[in-house]
Structures are given as C-alpha cells and as structure tokens.
C-alpha cells in the first residue's frame, strides 16, 4: 500500500489539472499562434508561468486504484500488476482466465 499522502497529493494534482485545463489550453494556443504579435504571445507565456505548477497534466502520476502503487500500472484496468493478479485469482475481473497449456 502506498503512502496516503502521496496518493492524496496526486488526487490534488488531478483536481488542479481539471480546473485549469481549459485556461492552460487557451494560453498555449495563443503562444503557438505565429500570427499573433510577439508581445501578446509573451504576455500569454507569463500568464501560463504564473499558473500553479501542479495544474499541468504532465505532473499527474498513474496510480493503482486499489493499492495506490505507482509502478507496473495497467491503464485499461487502472490497477497494478499485483492487484491485477489478486483480483484475477479471486474472479473479480470478468473474462480474465488463468492460463494453462
């Protein structure tokens, strides 16, 4: 089980990214638009830099929904390999069958 503080920190980052996502996208569009004057693009860049650092999507870490483990994460199921094995052995994931040959 991961530390509760690191899981909560990641959840706060997710909320900030959702909150500031449209504003960040609008500012980035202004910055990348070559037809805009340089001063306007520079002001947009300063506004983007003034936003909270944790509002960037890149700072979000994929974590297991069951254990909070940050590594060996299966995106499709949102669980780690260890939780996947436990849930699969208990028959809680539909369609997952233990292999035998």
Swiss-Prot record:
Any Pfam family: Ribosomal_S14
Where do the record's region annotations for Disordered lie? 1-21
Q: Give the top-rank taxon of the lineage listed in the UniProt record for this protein.
A: Bacteria
Return the InterPro entries for the record: Ribosomal_uS14, Ribosomal_uS14_bac/plastid, Ribosomal_uS14_CS
Q: Does the keyword Ribosomal protein apply?
A: yes
Gene3D superfamilies the UniProt entry points to: 1.10.287.1480
Q: Which GO terms describe its molecular function?
A: rRNA binding; structural constituent of ribosome
Keywords of the record, alphabetical order, are: Ribonucleoprotein, Ribosomal protein, RNA-binding, rRNA-binding
Where is it found, in Gene Ontology cellular component terms? cytoplasm; small ribosomal subunit
Q: Does the keyword rRNA-binding apply?
A: yes
One GO BP on record is: translation
- PROSITE patterns for this protein: RIBOSOMAL_S14
Its function? Binds 16S rRNA, required for the assembly of 30S particles and may also be responsible for determining the conformation of the 16S rRNA at the A site.
Could you give the subunit structure recorded for this chain?
Answer: Part of the 30S ribosomal subunit. Contacts proteins S3 and S10.
Q: Which family does it belong to?
A: Belongs to the universal ribosomal protein uS14 family.
Protein name per UniProt: Small ribosomal subunit protein uS14
In which organism is this protein found? Mesorhizobium japonicum (strain LMG 29417 / CECT 9101 / MAFF 303099) (Mesorhizobium loti (strain MAFF 303099))
């Amino acid at each position: 089980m991961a530390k509760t503080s690191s899981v909560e920190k990641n959840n706060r980052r997710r909320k900030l990214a959702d909150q500031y996502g449209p504003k960040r996208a609008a500012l980035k569009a202004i910055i990348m638009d070559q037809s805009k004057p340089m001063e306007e693009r520079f002001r947009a860049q300063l506004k983007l830099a003034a936003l909270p650092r944790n509002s960037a999507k890149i700072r979000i870490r994929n974590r297991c929904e069951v254990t909070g483990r940050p590594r060996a994460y299966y995106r499709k199921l949102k669980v780690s390999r260890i939780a996947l094995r436990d849930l699969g052995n208990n028959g809680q994931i539909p369609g997952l069958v233990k292999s035998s040959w």
